Amino acid sequence: MRIHIVNPSDMSFGVGVITPRWLYVLAGCTPAKYGDPIIVDETLEQIDPATIQQGDIVGIGIHTGNALRGLALGRMAWERGAWVIYGGIHATLFPDEPRDLGAAHAVVKGDGDHVWPEVIADCVAGRLK
């Protein structure tokens, strides 16, 4: 089981334009017993779907500008058997969208760093709240 933390984007520039801080905040909140998370900022490089395996956890942060790409990533991860967790301002304001359109197992509303370790533990236990 691996943990992927993804900032979705339709376009990759190959250089960091504005890398979101939340990627590293959640990485820092990931308990060490689960290993280092795989951080993917798609403004730098698109995610390789082959890296997502059954049982992995995929955290996707969306805002309105990248929501469609994020929802597509969630569906792809779900089809590969991964746990799909959404967060970010768009998911907070419109939590039904990731559930209805993005194959979400769960949506974190508000600051994710407070609940991220619990979300991971719930996925590992096979029982999300």
Can you describe what each PLM-predicted range is?
Residues 2-14, 57:
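Nucleotide-activated donor-dependent transferases that construct or modify glycoconjugates
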